[in-house]
């Protein structure tokens, strides 16, 4: 079974790749892509918080 932290990080990576693609589209003038970039960045922020919580929980279980 894969570690929850690894799963969250892989999801963050996927979100980041999609955000980068949409950032390029936004730079070319597609304003809708800018909205998708902002949404992806919010998702990444939430995933980062989930990673911090999960790491803390796993650390506390060890001791």
Residue ranges and their predicted role:
Residues 16, 41, 48:
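Short amphipathic alpha-helical/adjacent loop interface patches that line ligand
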Residues 1-22:
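N-terminal acidic leader/helix
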Residues 19, 23-27, 55-58, 62:
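Secondary-structure edge/capping motif, primarily at the C-terminal ends of alpha-helices
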Residues 44-54:
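Amphipathic alpha-helical coiled-coil segments
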Residues 3-6, 37, 48:
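Metal-centered catalytic cores of metalloenzymes
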Residues 34-42:
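Short, charged, amphipathic alpha-helical segments
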Residues 27-35:
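Short, surface-exposed loop/turn segments at secondary-structure junctions
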């Amino acid at each position: 079974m894969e570690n929850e932290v690894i799963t969250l990080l892989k999801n963050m990576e996927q979100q980041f790749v999609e955000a980068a693609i949409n950032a390029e589209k936004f730079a070319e003038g597609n304003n809708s892509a800018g909205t998708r970039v902002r949404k992806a960045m919010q998702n990444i922020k939430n995933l980062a918080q989930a990673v911090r919580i999960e790491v803390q929980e796993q650390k506390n279980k060890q001791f």
